[in-house]
From Swiss-Prot:
Name of the protein in question: Alpha N-terminal protein methyltransferase 1
Organism of derivation: Caenorhabditis briggsae
Enzymatic class: transferase
Disulphide bridges: none
Ligase is among the record's keywords: no
Function comment: Alpha-N-methyltransferase that methylates the N-terminus of target proteins containing the N-terminal motif [Ala/Pro/Ser]-Pro-Lys when the initiator Met is cleaved. Specifically catalyzes mono-, di- or tri-methylation of exposed alpha-amino group of Ala or Ser residue in the [Ala/Ser]-Pro-Lys motif and mono- or di-methylation of Pro in the Pro-Pro-Lys motif.
Family matches, as InterPro entries: MeTrfase_NTM1, SAM-dependent_MTases_sf
Cellular compartments per GO CC: cytoplasm
Length: 231
């Protein structure tokens, strides 16, 4: 797969440089496409509520926002739903800016300043782990390893959600500006399988301009968890 042609550490360093230069506002977090914010949050909220109705995660107690930036998703999607939300991001300046963007709020838990290529969520803490527009920065082996660490971060019955661009081309595409890959859906399914995750729900983002890559949302459950009653 093409990510093996790139050195992971080199890609990660360049991605950090890119996001360190991004404006610390919603427009910066969305790569200049601020108008995506409202339809993005609307569809994501509907997706989470649908998961809860189907009992695909236990409660609205604790969520984790991976690649949180200044906290756009934390503030507008997760905080209105969950009692407590932790944030993770590689860029310290963005996490620091989140305090001003979100304000002081007891629903904000820990803020982790670390890249997802090494970040290990606290074990058995989260009902929902939300991963949006950040997985494309990881090479294949690091993506699978990250998913495995996320599984350990789930409470029993918890759920992982991946929301990201997906290409309809035969092969993934590499963005030389932000140093990320847009993977194909079969490549993502391969990564899920490598981490023993089953994709239990999938939807496509609506309301985005046609020139934007398709954005899909995947709900993932640990395979062993799903089959434990049969063992």
């Amino acid at each position: 797969m093409s990510s093996r042609l790139h050195n992971g550490n080199d890609v990660y360093e360049k991605a950090e440089e890119y996001w360190s230069r991004a404006s610390q506002d919603v427009n910066g977090m969305l790569g200049g496409f601020e108008t995506l914010h409202t339809p993005d949050i609307t569809v994501s909220k509907r997706f989470i509520e649908g998961l809860k109705k189907r009992n695909l995660f236990g409660s609205y107690d604790y969520a984790l926002d991976c690649g949180a930036g200044i906290g756009r998703v934390t503030k507008h999607l997760l905080m209105p739903l969950f009692k407590k939300v932790d944030m993770e991001d590689l860029v310290e300046e963005l996490i620091v800016s989140s305090e001003q963007y979100i304000g002081s709020d007891p629903r904000i838990g820990e803020k982790f300043i670390e890249g997802i290529q090494t970040f290990a969520p606290p074990e058995r803490r989260y009902d929902l782990i939300w991963i949006q527009w950040v997985s494309g920065h990881l090479v294949d082996e690091d993506l699978v390893a990250f998913f495995k660490r996320c599984v350990k971060g789930l409470k029993p019955g918890g759920c992982i959600v991946l929301k990201d661009n997906v290409t309809n081309h035969e092969k993934r595409l590499f963005d030389d500006e932000d140093h990320s890959w847009t993977r194909t859906e079969p490549e993502l399914m391969e990564a899920f399988n490598g981490a023993d995750l089953d994709m239990v729900v999938k939807t496509i983002q609506t309301g985005f301009p046609k020139e934007i890559y398709p954005v899909k949302i995947f709900a993932l459950k640990p395979r062993r968890q799903e089959t434990s009653d049969d063992n």
